[in-house]
Amino acid sequence: MPLSSPVSRALRHTRAIHIDAFARDDGLWDLDARITDVKVKDVTLASGVRPGGVFLHDLSLRITINRELTIVDAEAASDAVPYPGYCDTIGPAYKRLIGLNLMKGFRLGVKERLSGVLGCTHLTELANILPTAAIQAYANDVIKTRDGNGDDQLPDRPFQIDKCHALRADGPGVAKYYPRWVAALVNE
């Protein structure tokens, strides 16, 4: 269902987030993430006037992960920033993502390593959305998914159960799509 029709309004700012996922020839996987901010009108900053339509932020983050979804490499680039010579020096800090696992304590690890003055607000928020992008990208390749038809005899329950309201273990979504796992929960 789409959003309701808005009242009369004027665009002031556009933030775009884009993530591409790649399977590499060496067996690793890359997530390339980019965040951009553009103002419609000129904006006066401490560093000078940024004309409308020109990037205020154009920031990129690439992480390389293995099949266990552990980050084995990371890099960041700041191609447009409000404080040139300052904002764009933080890129090397994002190597601190190496060793974190996207499925186990990732957001807490990001906070500990890159929050506040340890990182860039926008690159760090970009990092925080990578786990769900990885799940979408690698379902059936790295993360095993199931069709829920009840014929699946694997001993572990599907990872997506209890990860959102639609697939809560005691709900109608799991009863319909993963009936074996609702029954297993009730009988335990």
Language-model-detected regions and their locations in the chain:
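N-terminal intrinsically disordered, cationic/polar leader segments
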Residues: S4-G48
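Active-site- and interface-proximal helix/loop "cap" or "latch" segments in soluble metabolic
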Residues: D37-E188
